Structures are given as structure tokens and as C-alpha cells.
């Protein structure tokens, strides 16, 4: 409400007080106004609530409270979630706190800060998340300011199965230290089961921040500052998922396809959950009871043994099915089991980081345990395992099209290991173990780094081979329902046209109606020489360049290991050739597209 409107309402202030407020407000920025509102609220809760306005204004200007700034660099939302929890805990502890998306934070402002915590995930091959590219580059440039007065902490999130584990967090730590900043707490690098150690680190960090701020400004009125960007609110979350209903699980690859890809439909009716194109759905799943039994047999346990999980005593069998990751191996598991079993093969792998990473990334837990049989205690077994985490799937529907449903495109992991068939955890849960009508626990993971342009007239280029097509089904449904005038160009690729053309009928319908203006496909095994989406991009290089000149946004979804790199290289070649630029200039041009959010990727 504007201050000038106060006089027309039943206000407890007299005209002189209103005039004083108007005068003070005219000289303050929006952030300062928000601070003042919190300051006055704090005064109202104390015995000094009758302090005159002019005295309060003087207090605001002469005794600003120290604050903690939290910056999150997040690709899929995990780092954002940790940062939001940190912000809430700081506010509850009476610490003035402000939360920033890294894309909204200007690096030069660090010189004015006293206490900062950065929560950073790592994208692809050690790259900064899209929302942190600009800040990441700034801090390693000559423009980075001296930060002698800054005290900082860093939480890195990652997956130890990858070579550049928590690299972005390590980078920020190094950048800040180089500029003279002092860590008030040691950086922590957290694996996929990060929740418990992250909570402990947050507690330690906030204890140190509270003590430091108290000593800096004993008399300052501590208030809570606003979050830099409004967060999505819902009663359901990763920690409190919604129990939804599976409506459909339909195979959409041909009977002779080497792949089993499912179109999944889930009912959200009554949940209040909302999502936008580009968001992901988190799915909590249960492990295969048969796999749990096989693991127990391999290590000489029955499953009846009691183990403590989250303060509760449950059977080991139940723990393996519901609480622990028993499908995918990881380097730590391989290294620890090498010690427990005395396996020479595993010991040799553990001594070579590259081979260890490759082995653990392509091997399931049961196959690691089968390298050499060893009898374990229940505690030793669960000590080897990570906690179960939900799987995130790109949402393949627009809510403007499907209303109270959410659709997924799930590639079922299934392959032979010797004489045994191995299955993926979440994908086999959704495709084989759940029946239509069964419950499934889900939550929405918002992704602000993969969003359609706000301008409906902007052209869009979508590159999504395989199940990477999922978000683009959502994009096109949304653009259709919004009557967006912008052109849409889809690149899709897979193995065989007759077996693996996902949602073929839908794309042909959209092409015929003009919603999709151009569709280019690459089926790698339909000819002797393999053809992939990056080849189609290069074939249409002149047209791609023209679309970029017309303001097109480029989106890439799918495999990070090869496809995303090859597409990135193809885009650089397009810019170099048709933009008449040097290689270095072309790389910079593509990088500027990313900074401007005109080149967005959801790769995994």
C-alpha cells in the first residue's frame, strides 16, 4: 500500500507522522524499504514499541544490522533447496539473511559483504550451473574485487561417480580465497546423499555467523531480509512428497526396438501441485525385493537383522528396499568393499581413479559384491550403501494441456550381466513393479534454468534425442495453448525410424497444423553411416544461424557425456562459419547466448 493512501484510510498515524514516513520513504531504495519494514516490526515486538518515528529512522541509518547473504548456483534445484533451508534456519536463529539466485547477484557486491555462503552444484564436466556462469567468470576475471573484509563458506554438491566432483564449489572457494576473503568454516563437498551432512554443516556455519554478527553489531536490530526471488510454495516437497496415482504406463517404442521407453501418466488431482514446462518430477521409488534378497544372500545375511535408520529400528530387508541405494554402485562403495573383501581386482581398481570411476559408473552393487564373496555384518552392509534418493525426470506435459496430470518419458534400464538381467531402480519401479492405480510418491522440482522465453514471438530451437524429447513435448503443448506466434524447430534423434520415433503421431500432427514449423530427425542405424542430431544441425547451419540472428532460443536435453558436447561443438561451428568469426569469437558468442538464457541445457 502506498504511503499517500494512508490518510484516506483508518490509520493510527497522524498527519505529521505520515509526512515523516513519506519523506523517509522517498529517500530509500526498495531493499532499504523492506529492511525498514522488518526493523519497525521488530520494534513493535519489544517494550520500546512506542519509540518515535524520527528516532527509529535515526537508528536505522546509524545502526544497520549485519547480515548473511546466501547465493545458490543450482542446475536441477538441489543446491537451491539447501540454500532455502539455510535461509529459513538463519532467520529462525535471528540472523538477518538474504537469499540470491546466482544469476541475480552482481559479483562486485561481494566487496560490500561481510558474510556470504555459496551453495553450488556442478554441471556436466565440472562446469558451473547455467545460473552461475556469469558470477563464476567474473570471479576469475581481472574485474574481481579485493575481498579482504569478506568471510565466507561454501557447500559443494555433486556425485562422486563423476570426475569433477563438486568442482564448482571448489572453484568458488579458490576464487574467493585468491581475492583475500577468509573462510569462516571449511568447505564441504557432499555426495548424492547430502541431506544429513548438509544439515550438520548448516548448523555449524550458522553458529559461527551468529556469533560473528553479534560481536560486530551488539546494538543492531536484527531483522529478516526478503528473498531475492520469490520461491515456489507448496506443502509437498522432496522431504514431504505427494502420494499420487499411476494412471498409465505405456510402451512407446516398437516391439522390435532395442529400447523400452514408457509414456507415464500420473494423477495429481487435489494435490495443488503446479509445474511449468522445463520443470522435473521427483519420484521416490522402492527397490526390488528380489534384488535386496540377492544382496543379502551374497553377504551371508538373512534380512531379519535389525538396523537403525533415522532413529528407528527396522529390519535389514526393509531398509534395503525402502531406505538405501542398492542399484547403482559408486567409487566409495567399491573402495570400501575392496578393503572388506580383500578382492585384488577391486583393490587395483581403487588405486586408479579413472578406472574406478568408469567401473563404478557402469556396475551395479550386486556385481561389485560378486567380485569376491565376503560375509558382512548388517552394519557393514548399510555402511557401504548410500541413502536412497529420488530420481528426477523431465516433465513431458504442459499443465495447460493436461490439467491435474503430469506426464513423463522414461527409458527403462535393462541389460544382461552374464546370465543375469539387471534393471534400473526407478525406471523398473515405474514400468514393471507398479500397476495402474498404484500409489507413487512425487514432488515437483522447479528448474528456472530451462524455461521458455517470456516473449511468445521468440523463435525456439529444441534439440532432444531419445528421452531428451520429454521437455519439448511440454514446450510445444504450452506454446500451442498460449497461441504463441514464435516459430518452433525440433531436432530429434534415435536408432531406428520405425521402432524409436517417440511421439511420432503427435509431432506429425503439430507439423501439419503449423505449431512445429520444422522437424529434422536423425536415426543412427537406418543407414550404414551413423547420423546424429549434431549432423542435422550442421546440414542446416545457415538456417540455424539465421534463426539465431532472429533472436531464437536454443534448448538441449539429454545425454551429457557425448550428445551435449557434440551439439555444443556443432553450434560453435555454425557461428564460426556463418557468423564469419574466429574460433575464439564463436565460443564467446555461444557463451553470451548462455548468459542471456538464449542457450539452455538440461543434460544428465
UniProtKB/Swiss-Prot annotation:
It catalyses: hydrogen sulfide + 3 NADP(+) + 3 H2O = sulfite + 3 NADPH + 4 H(+). It is an enzyme of class 1 (oxidoreductase). Pathway: Sulfur metabolism; hydrogen sulfide biosynthesis; hydrogen sulfide from sulfite (NADPH route): step 1/1. One of its GO terms (molecular function) is flavin adenine dinucleotide binding. Belongs to the NADPH-dependent sulphite reductase flavoprotein subunit CysJ family. In the N-terminal section; belongs to the flavodoxin family. Residues 68-206 form the Flavodoxin-like domain. This is Sulfite reductase [NADPH] flavoprotein alpha-component. One of its GO terms (cellular component) is cytosol. Binds 1 FAD per subunit. Component of the sulfite reductase complex that catalyzes the 6-electron reduction of sulfite to sulfide. This is one of several activities required for the biosynthesis of L-cysteine from sulfate. The flavoprotein component catalyzes the electron flow from NADPH -> FAD -> FMN to the hemoprotein component. FAD binds at residues 327, 361, 391-394, 409-411, 415, 424-427, 604. Residues 239-453 form the FAD-binding FR-type domain. Keywords: Amino-acid biosynthesis, Cysteine biosynthesis, Electron transport, FAD, Flavoprotein, FMN, NADP, Oxidoreductase, Transport.
Amino acid at each position: 500500500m502506498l504511503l499517500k493512501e494512508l490518510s484516506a484510510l483508518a490509520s493510527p498515524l497522524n498527519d505529521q507522522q505520515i509526512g515523516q514516513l513519506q519523506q523517509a520513504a522517498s529517500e530509500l531504495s526498495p531493499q532499504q524499504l523492506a529492511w525498514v519494514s522488518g526493523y519497525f516490526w521488530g520494534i513493535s515486538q519489544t517494550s520500546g514499541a512506542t519509540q518515535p518515528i524520527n528516532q527509529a529512522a535515526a537508528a536505522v541509518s546509524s545502526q544497520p544490522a549485519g547480515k548473511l547473504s546466501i547465493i545458490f548456483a543450482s542446475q536441477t534445484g538441489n543446491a537451491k533447496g539447501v540454500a532455502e533451508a539455510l535461509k529459513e534456519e538463519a532467520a529462525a536463529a535471528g540472523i538477518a539473511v538474504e537469499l540470491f539466485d546466482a544469476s541475480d547477484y552482481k559479483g562486485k557486491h561481494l566487496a560490500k559483504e561481510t558474510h556470504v555462503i555459496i551453495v553450488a552444484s556442478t554441471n556436466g564436466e565440472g562446469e558451473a550451473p547455467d545460473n552461475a556462469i556469469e558470477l563464476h567468470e567474473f570471479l576469475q576475471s581481472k574485474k574481481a574485487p579485493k575481498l579482504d573484509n569478506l568471510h565466507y563458506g561454501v557447500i559443494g554438491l555433486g556425485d562422486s561417480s563423476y570426475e569433477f566432483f563438486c568442482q564448482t564449489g571448489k572453484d568458488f572457494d579458490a576464487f574467493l580465497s585468491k581475492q583475500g576473503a577468509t573462510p569462516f568454516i571449511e568447505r564441504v563437498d557432499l555426495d548424492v546423499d547430502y541431506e544429513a551432512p548438509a544439515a550438520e554443516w548448516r548448523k555449524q556455519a550458522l553458529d559461527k555467523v551468529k556469533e560473528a554478527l553479534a560481536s560486530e553489531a551488539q546494538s543492531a536490530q536484527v531483522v529478516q531480509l526478503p528473498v531475492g526471488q520469490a520461491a515456489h510454495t507448496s506443502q509437498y516437497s522432496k522431504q514431504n512428497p505427494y502420494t499420487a496415482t499411476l494412471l498409465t504406463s505405456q510402451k512407446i517404442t516398437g516391439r522390435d526396438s532395442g529400447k523400452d521407453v514408457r509414456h507415464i501418466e500420473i494423477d495429481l488431482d487435489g494435490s495443488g501441485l503446479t509445474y511449468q514446462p522445463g520443470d522435473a518430477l521427483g519420484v521416490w521409488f522402492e527397490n526390488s525385493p528380489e534384488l535386496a534378497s540377492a544382496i543379502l544372500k551374497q553377504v551371508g545375511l538373512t534380512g531379519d537383522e535389525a538396523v537403525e535408520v533415522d532413529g528407528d529400528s527396522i529390519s535389514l530387508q526393509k531398509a534395503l528396499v525402502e531406505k538405501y541405494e542398492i542399484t547403482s554402485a559408486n567409487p566409495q562403495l567399491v573402495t570400501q568393499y575392496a578393503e572388506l573383501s580383500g578382492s585384488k581386482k577391486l583393490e587395483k581398481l581403487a588405486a586408479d581413479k579413472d578406472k574406478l570411476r568408469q567401473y563404478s559408473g557402469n556396475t551395479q552393487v550386486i556385481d561389485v559384491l560378486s567380485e569376491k564373496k565376503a560375509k558382512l555384518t548388517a552394519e557393514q552392509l548399510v555402511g557401504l550403501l548410500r541413502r536412497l534418493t529420488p530420481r528426477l525426470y523431465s516433465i513431458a506435459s504442459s499443465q495447460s494441456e493436461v490439467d491435474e496430470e503430469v506426464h513423463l518419458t522414461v527409458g527403462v534400464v535393462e541389460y544382461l550381466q552374464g546370465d543375469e538381467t539387471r534393471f534400473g531402480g526407478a525406471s523398473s519401479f515405474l514400468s514393471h513393479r507398479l500397476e495402474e492405480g498404484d500409489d507413487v510418491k512425487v514432488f515437483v522440482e522447479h528448474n528456472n534454468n530451462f524455461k521458455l522465453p517470456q516473449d511468445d514471438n521468440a523463435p525456439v530451437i529444441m534439440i532432444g534425442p531419445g528421452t531428451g524429447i520429454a521437455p519439448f513435448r511440454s514446450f510445444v503443448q504450452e506454446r500451442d495453448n498460449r497461441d504463441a506466434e514464435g516459430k518452433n524447430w525440433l531436432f530429434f534423434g534415435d536408432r531406428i525410424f520405425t521402432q524409436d520415433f517417440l511421439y511420432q503421431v503427435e509431432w506429425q500432427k503439430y507439423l501439419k497444423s503449423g505449431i512445429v514449423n520444422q522437424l529434422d530427425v536423425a536415426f543412427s542405424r537406418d543407414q550404414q553411416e551413423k547420423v546424429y542430431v549434431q549432423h542435422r544441425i550442421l546440414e542446416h547451419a545457415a538456417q540455424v544461424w539465421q534463426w539465431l540472428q532472429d533472436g531464437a532460443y536454443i534448448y538441449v536435453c539429454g545425454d551429457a557425456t557425448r550428445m551435449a558436447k557434440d551439439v555444443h561443438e556443432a553450434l560453435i561451428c555454425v557461428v564460426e562459419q556463418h557468423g564469419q568469426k574466429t574460433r575464439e569469437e564463436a565460443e564467446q558468442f555461444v557463451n553470451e547466448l548462455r548468459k542471456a538464457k538464449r542457450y539452455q541445457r538440461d543434460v544428465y
